[in-house]
Amino acid sequence: MIEVTGLAKRFPMARQKERRAKRRDPREQQGWFQAVRDVSFECAPGEVLGLLGPNGAGKTTALRIVSTALRPDAGRAFIDGIDILAEPLQARRRIGFLSGTTGLYGRLSARENVEYFGRLHGMAPERLRRRCDALFEQLDMHEFAHKRADSLSSGMKQKCAIARTVIHEPSILILDEPTTGLDVMSAKIVLDFVASYKALRIPVILSTHHLHEVDKLCDRVCIVNHGASIFQGTVEQLRHLGGGGDLYDAFVHVIHHGA
Amino acid sequence: MWTVYAKELLELLRDRKTFVFTVLLPILAMPLIFGSLGYLSSFMFRNAQQAELTYAIFGKQHAPQLAERFAREKSLREVPLAQPEAIKAAIADERIKFALVIPPGFQDALGAHRQASIALHYNNAVALDITSKRVLAVIEQHNGALRAQALASFKLSRDQLDFALDPVRLEVRSTAGKRERIGALVGGFLPYILLMVCLMAAMYPAIDLGAGEKERGTLETLLLAPVPRGALVLAKFLVLFTVGLTSALLMVASMGLLLTLFGGALQGAMQQGVRAIGARDLAMVALMLVPTAAIFASILLALSIYAKSYKEAAGLISPLMMLIIVPIALAMLPGVELNWFWAMVPLTNVSLAMKELVKGTMDYRMFFAILLSTSVIAGVLLAWCRWWFEREQVLFRN
């Protein structure tokens, strides 16, 4: 279970930029860029929440806050009742995070990459070994487990990144545009993985630009624009807003006119 | 923290480039370069001293004895030249190295107990002026013979002649031991090389550990691991520290080994000087390297983690190299000696201390003061690096 309310985060802006791009974005003020102003959402077990929004809407920043990489200026977030601001280390143990730009250590083998993060999560050697064996079996990775990550194909790398994400048996998953830049086969590996975790009744937050992924996997949707969440509801409710059955129309409608 | 440390080291060991830079370069290349350079320069010097010099001589008939003396020199060979006007051209196209012109009346002047002179033509636009030294040596022999004659004809005793020649003679008694003089020579550039190796060895790993994590997209996941950021910084810092220090220490060790094995092959004074540098001095040089390596590691890590890519990191670090050379090179300037003023200048003091250690004239109070101040600077820099690492603007600059 994850609950996020009223997140806000601003970044200082470079001075020159400030003068040039005067007030093009309503979030700019006095040298600060209000990347996230008011984002709230929640995601229950067995649910996949689709986080949608145009580029630069503040999705990544919001997800970085939830995954404790950034500290918010305002707002609260709880993971299984743990306040992520008060106990970030505890929260991190429960989060599995994957993004489209996530990389691997090229000079380590696939298995070493996964084990490294297991150890960082403080897993005991025996538990780590069993968990690794199980994951490599499940993702069919034994063939290339001892190859250097450098020499793996993109599909193999993606499997490796997934194994790394869930090595510590997280209780929630945060996926930030996990399929961006992937070919169809690699993207499918990721989507199958999301489906399998949904079946395990683990809450998944999926930020994406691909509406067919939303259609296929998500139960509920949160749309973020200009740093604020402007729509929350089920996929059906969103479809309804568009007038017809088309998610694209509905999405564009929400961005232009609000919910 | 040790998990991160072990993993980073493992990763670096698998990288051939780093391995070559940190291990092979200091152990093999440096002694090799300096060994061959030293051998080559002494070889060239000896060659120049013994090589055959061709010369032309005019007015032989005015000073037959002197001309004969030159003719007797084995390594000098006379080349006939038509007239004195051709000297310049002949030297320019290297037919002769030098020319002597003896004026008429040379012998008469000497006969009348007056000073006589001859002209030496040669190209003195060279670093080591060996030609004039060799000509002078021949002239000096001749002078010696003439003095002996004069002694007889003036009817002066040996003591009286000495008085007439040099009423006051300066006796130079050096208080510096042989080691001190050799140390002053070697000690000047030793710290320069050691510190540069220490910095250069850690440079590539630094880029990999900081900017590399960003470029590969692994930093984000690393930050999300339940490891405090302070521990991450410390682990990465320790890796760089290990690499830099290992590299420099390996070089000290390999030079020590080289000196014990081949020290005997060095000539006279050099050998004694080298012998006198004991294990204790080398150990103290190594001790000096510890906080210095820490300073380098902190600065490199801070710059690297700020950079967005390998390229930017390399761009940030190269000016740093230039900047760090300055205080180290300062120690090589004449007149810059270790005193309490220079002992307070970071890096310069380390260089100077190493020089003093090699010379064997270290003031130990100053040694510990420098060690302490360098450690304090290293500590402050590490703390700064840690604070720097916790800044979101540094970690997520995009």
Name these PLM-found stretches.
Chain A
Residues L173-D176:
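Catalytic Walker B motif of ABC-type/P-loop ATPase nucleotide-binding domains
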Residues E169:
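Conserved catalytic motifs of ABC-family nucleotide-binding domains
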Residues R148-L152:
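Conserved ABC ATPase signature
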Residues Q232-G233:
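ABC ATPase "signature
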